[in-house]
Structure formats: C-alpha cells, structure tokens
A protein has these predicted regions:
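Low-complexity, small/basic-enriched stretches
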Residues: 1-47, 114-122, 126-148
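Short, leucine-enriched amphipathic alpha-helices that occur as contiguous helical runs
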Residues: 55, 59-63, 90
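Short helix/strand-capping hinge loops at secondary-structure junctions
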Residues: 69-72
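Alpha-helical residues within the helix-turn-helix
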Residues: 82
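Short Lys/Arg-enriched helix C-cap and helix-to-coil transition segments
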Residues: 104-111
C-alpha cells in the first residue's frame, strides 16, 4: 500500500492514479491463481485486460505488441521494432521494452537479441532465463538454462 501526502494538488493525484491504473486492480485472486499456474508451466495466457494510460505513444505501441508474442516463442528487438513500425529506432524500442511496468503478464521476457543472447531484463537475466525455461520446458535441452 502506498500513502501520498499531497496538499492542494489535484493534478498530482490524477497523475498518480494514471501511473497506477494498469496494475491497480490487476492482482485479484483470479490473476494470482493464473500467475501461480504460469510459474508451474500450466498457464499460457492471462485473462486480464490491460489499458496503459501512462507512457509515450511508442511505449504503448511496443507494450501492445509484446502482448501478441505467443507463449514459448521469442522475438528479436529488431523484429519487434519492425512490427511496431519503428524499424529505425531499435534502441528506443528496446528502452520501451525495459520500461514495461507489468512483467510476465506483458511478456517482455520473450524479447531477445538478434544473435540469440538474452539481452537485458529489468528483473535480472536469471529471471528472464527462468521464465523462458518455464515456457519451453517441453524441449529436451533449453538454450536458456545457462543464462547466456
């Protein structure tokens, strides 16, 4: 729980509400159950609808595209840039991926470098490798186990 002490500043209160809106009511019992099942490799999709109110147009477009990456699949940063019509702004797209406020549910862990390296991850490379391992656990030998 967060407490904000604001004196005579309705605009700041509105901004805080906008910042928290994508995750404000997200963690209900259904989603907690779905996350638990996902971490056990038994849940592939999440039933929650996310509307990002906060973020640049580029970020919102990238985050929307992240939600289209299928379970168990990966995409390169450059291919993601192409899919979002920002093919000449790969670094900006990668930065938008890194600013994703809702990991796992908006699966930024599925974005990797063009050469197959994992690239970065806000919650750490080991976590990214683990999430990808969960999703590809049916494969005999996952390339992600080493945290490359």
């Amino acid at each position: 729980m967060f407490f904000y002490f604001i004196k005579n500043n309705d605009l700041r209160v509105k901004k805080i509400k906008e910042e928290l809106s994508p995750i404000r009511n997200l963690f209900n019992s259904t989603l907690k159950n779905q996350l638990s099942r996902y971490l056990k490799g038994k849940q592939k999709n999440f039933s929650c609808k996310i509307n990002f109110l906060n973020g640049t147009d580029l970020q919102k477009k990238v985050w929307a595209q992240l939600q289209k990456i299928s379970y168990g699949k990966t995409i390169s940063y450059s291919h993601l840039a192409l899919k979002t019509s920002y093919q000449k702004a790969i670094r900006a797209v990668a930065t938008a991926v890194g600013k994703n406020p809702i990991g796992i549910i908006v699966p930024c862990h599925r974005v990797i470098a063009k050469d197959g390296r994992l690239g970065g991850y806000a919650w750490g490379i080991k976590m990214k490798a683990k999430l990808l391992d969960i999703e590809v656990s049916g494969m005999a030998d996952s390339i992600y186990r080493g945290g490359k």
